[in-house]
């Protein structure tokens, strides 16, 4: 596993973004782990997060893109900070673009923030975590309504590796539906592998009991 992936996993734990216990998801699933990206709150955290995204984007796409698109609302600060990180680390001067939930009728009018989309622009969608892919299904019509852009793919922080609407993961369903590349900084499989019996700040994050619970969860909800 790449060094930056290991560092990202520890970063999520230390930021209290990734926690283990007993939780209920929005869809009603009882899960032994929870990912709350709302706990990235400080400038330091966002700076580090953006660097992890930048490294994963470069690993998966190189410099084959022009614009980072961040779906509102969480994708807005992501697209901005990751664009800055790409410039700082790799010298890639990508633009950022996001959508508004409400269209403005004054000043900077329209549905988009940031760069104007033009025909042929190569776009990467930057998301936090996708379970059902809902925001992407909402994003694609917005992109196509603005210009005939070339969506190269989507990058998320963690692939939960759970079934979407059918027996496949949400990312796999998006790939099959739209034909673009789907990738993540890490997968939950990598997370569990790295954190099993791993001591962070004096605490073992995933012990045998938690590992068994995670395995049972994926027997029921994991991708086949």
UniProtKB/Swiss-Prot annotation:
Annotated orotate binding sites: 131, 160
Annotated coiled-coil segments of the chain: none
Cellular-component GO terms for this entry: cytoplasm
Xref: InterPro entries: OPRT (IPR023031), Or_phspho_trans_dom (IPR004467), PRibTrfase_dom (IPR000836), PRTase-like (IPR029057)
Cofactor: Mg(2+)
Keyword terms, alphabetized: Glycosyltransferase, Magnesium, Pyrimidine biosynthesis, Transferase
Enzyme kind, highest EC tier: transferase
Family: Belongs to the purine/pyrimidine phosphoribosyltransferase family. PyrE subfamily.
Name of this chain's protein: Orotate phosphoribosyltransferase
Species per Swiss-Prot/TrEMBL record: Clostridium acetobutylicum (strain ATCC 824 / DSM 792 / JCM 1419 / IAM 19013 / LMG 5710 / NBRC 13948 / NRRL B-527 / VKM B-1787 / 2291 / W)
